[in-house]
C-alpha cells in the first residue's frame, strides 16, 4: 500500500507533516453538556479516530461565541468560564486525540443566522446575527416559511463593532486551542454559517467596507486569519473550509470565489477544504443537482470534484482538501494521483468505521484490488416527513443515524 498516492505524507506551509492524505473531516458530534465544555463523551468518541491511522483528524465545530450555537449540544468557548478553565477542559481532549500521534485540528465556527431559537445563552427573544438582515429560506410552502420565521427569525445586520468582536473571538479560540495542544484550527466558512454568509453576495448586502465587492465580502475572513496568526506560533496550522459554488469558470459567482480564495491564501492559510451546501440547500449530504436531476448515488461519487478541478490551478501551492461523497478507494486515489486535490476528507464513512485507514484503505489484505468500497448508511426520510416540503428536514433525518451513532459511542464507548 506504500505505493498509493493516498499513503504519501504531505507537509503543510506551517511545517506540520501529515503522515498520509486521508483526513477525518468535521461532523457535529451533538454531545456537549450544558456547560458547553468537553467531557468524557468526547474522549470516547475521539479515541478510535486517534488510533485509526488518519493523516489528520478535524473535530466537529466548536462555537466561538456561547451566545449563538448551531444546536443546543454544540461545544463552545463559554463566556462563563476563564481561559484556564477552558484550556483545562480542552487539554484532556487534545491528549486523547494526540495519543497515537495523529495531527488534530479544531474546527472553529459561528452559526450566524443558522442558530435555532434558544440555542446558546442569548435568550429566546434575541435576534440572530448575520452579514445582513436576510432571513432563511428553507422552502416555499406555508409550513416551511412558518418554521423559518419561528426557529430562525430574521437576523440583524452586524455592526462594525460586532465584526471586531467576532474577529477577537476567533483569535481567542485559536489561542486556547494552541495552548491546549491541538495542532491547528480550521475556520468554518462553509455550509451557510456566519463566515459563509459574509462571503456570499446572496446573504451579504452591506454597503460598507465588509460588503459589495468580492474582496470586501472576504475582508472579515482575512482579518480573522491575520488575528489568529498574531495569537499562535508560526508552526500552528490554520486552515479554512469554503463552499463550492455553482456554474462554470466564466460565471461571476465562480470568479468571485477565485478572487476571495486568493485573498485567503495570501492571508496565510495552510490548507483549503472544499465542501458545499447550506441548511437551505444541503448538498454536502445529498450531492449537487446537475441539470435539474438529483444526484446519482449508484454511478457517481465525489460531489465537488469538478469544482476542485476548476479551482486547483488558482490556489498556488496551498494544499486542497476535498470532502463530500467519496465512497471508494479507487476514486480517492485517482483524485489525488491526478492532482485534482492533495487530500481526501471523509466524515460519514469515518463514523461507520473510525479505523478506516488502518483496517481498510491501507490494509493490503482488505484493499487488494485498490477499489474497496467505503460503507455509509443512507436513511431516507419517511414519506410523511417529505410532505412538509422542507428539504433540510428530509436530509437531517438521514443525518440523524450518524448523530445517534456518535451519541451512543459517547455514552458507552462502543
Curated annotation (Swiss-Prot):
EC number(s) given by UniProt: 1.-.-.-
SUPFAM superfamilies cross-referenced by the UniProt entry: FMN-linked oxidoreductases (SSF51395)
Enzyme class, first EC level, given as a word: oxidoreductase
Binding site for substrate: 188-191
Transmembrane intervals: none
InterPro entries assigned: Aldolase_TIM, NADH_flavin_oxidoreductase, OxRdtase_FMN_N
GO MF term (any one): oxidoreductase activity
GO BP of this protein: ilicicolin H biosynthetic process
Pathway: Mycotoxin biosynthesis
Catalytic activity: 8-epi-ilicicolin H = ilicicolin H
Binding-site residues for FMN, renumbered to this chain: 25-28, 107, 347-348
Keywords noted in UniProt: Flavoprotein, FMN, NADP, Oxidoreductase
Summary of the function given for this chain in its UniProt record: NADH-dependent flavin oxidoreductase; part of the gene cluster that mediates the biosynthesis of ilicicolin H, a 4-hydroxy-2-pyridonealkaloid that has potent and broad antifungal activities by inhibiting the mitochondrial respiration chain. IccE acts as an epimerase and catalyzes the conversion of 8-epi-ilicicolin H into the final product ilicicolin H. The biosynthesis of ilicicolin H starts with formation of the tetramic acid by the hybrid PKS-NRPS synthetase iccA with the partnering trans-enoyl reductase iccB since iccA lacks a designated enoylreductase (ER) domain.
Record-stated family: Belongs to the NADH:flavin oxidoreductase/NADH oxidase family.
Name listed for the protein in its UniProt record: NADH-dependent flavin oxidoreductase iccE
Organism listed in the record: Talaromyces variabilis
Amino acid at each position: 500500500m506504500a505505493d498509493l498516492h493516498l499513503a504519501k505524507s504531505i507537509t503543510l506551509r506551517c511545517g506540520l507533516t501529515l503522515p498520509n492524505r486521508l483526513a477525518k473531516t468535521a461532523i457535529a458530534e451533538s454531545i456537549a453538556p450544558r456547560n458547553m465544555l468537553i467531557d468524557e463523551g468526547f474522549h470516547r468518541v475521539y479515541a478510535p479516530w486517534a488510533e485509526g491511522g488518519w493523516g489528520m483528524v478535524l473535530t466537529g465545530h466548536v462555537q466561538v461565541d456561547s451566545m449563538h450555537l448551531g444546536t443546543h449540544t454544540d461545544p463552545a468557548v463559554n463566556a462563563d468560564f476563564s481561559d484556564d478553565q477552558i484550556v483545562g477542559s480542552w487539554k484532556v481532549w487534545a491528549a486523547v486525540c494526540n495519543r497515537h500521534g495523529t495531527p488534530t485540528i479544531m474546527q472553529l465556527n459561528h452559526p450566524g443566522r443558522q442558530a435555532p431559537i434558544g440555542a446558546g445563552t442569548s435568550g429566546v427573544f434575541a435576534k440572530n446575527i448575520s452579514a445582513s438582515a436576510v432571513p432563511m429560506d428553507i422552502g416555499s410552502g406555508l409550513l416551511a416559511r412558518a418554521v423559518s420565521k419561528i426557529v430562525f427569525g430574521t437576523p440583524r445586520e452586524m455592526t462594525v463593532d460586532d465584526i471586531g468582536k467576532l474577529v477577537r473571538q476567533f483569535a481567542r479560540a485559536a489561542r486556547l486551542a494552541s495552548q491546549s495542544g491541538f495542532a491547528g484550527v480550521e475556520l468554518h466558512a462553509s455550509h451557510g454559517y456566519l463566515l459563509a454568509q459574509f462571503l456570499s453576495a446572496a446573504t451579504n448586502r452591506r454597503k460598507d467596507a465588509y460588503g459589495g465587492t468580492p474582496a470586501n465580502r472576504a475582508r472579515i475572513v482575512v482579518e480573522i486569519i491575520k488575528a489568529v496568526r498574531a495569537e499562535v506560533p508560526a508552526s500552528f496550522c490554520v486552515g479554512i473550509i469554503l463552499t463550492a459554488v455553482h456554474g462554470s469558470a466564466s460565471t461571476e459567482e465562480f470568479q468571485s470565489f477565485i478572487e476571495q480564495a486568493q485573498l485567503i491564501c495570501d492571508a496565510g492559510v495552510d490548507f483549503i477544504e472544499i465542501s458545499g451546501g447550506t441548511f437551505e440547500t444541503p448538498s454536502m449530504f445529498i450531492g449537487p443537482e446537475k441539470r435539474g436531476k438529483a444526484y446519482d448515488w449508484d454511478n457517481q461519487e465525489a460531489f465537488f470534484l469538478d469544482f476542485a478541478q476548476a479551482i486547483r490551478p488558482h490556489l498556488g501551492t496551498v494544499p486542497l482538501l476535498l470532502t463530500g461523497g467519496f465512497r471508494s478507494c479507487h476514486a480517492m486515489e485517482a483524485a489525488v494521483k491526478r492532482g485534482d486535490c492533495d487530500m481526501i476528507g471523509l466524515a460519514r464513512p469515518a463514523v461507520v468505521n473510525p479505523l478506516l485507514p488502518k483496517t481498510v484503505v491501507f490494509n493490503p489484505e482488505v484493499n487488494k484490488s485498490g477499489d474497496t468500497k467505503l460503507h455509509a448508511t443512507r436513511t431516507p426520510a419517511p414519506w410523511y416527513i417529505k410532505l412538509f416540503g422542507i428539504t433540510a428536514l428530509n436530509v437531517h433525518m438521514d443525518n440523524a443515524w450518524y448523530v445517534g451513532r456518535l451519541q451512543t459511542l459517547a455514552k458507552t464507548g462502543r
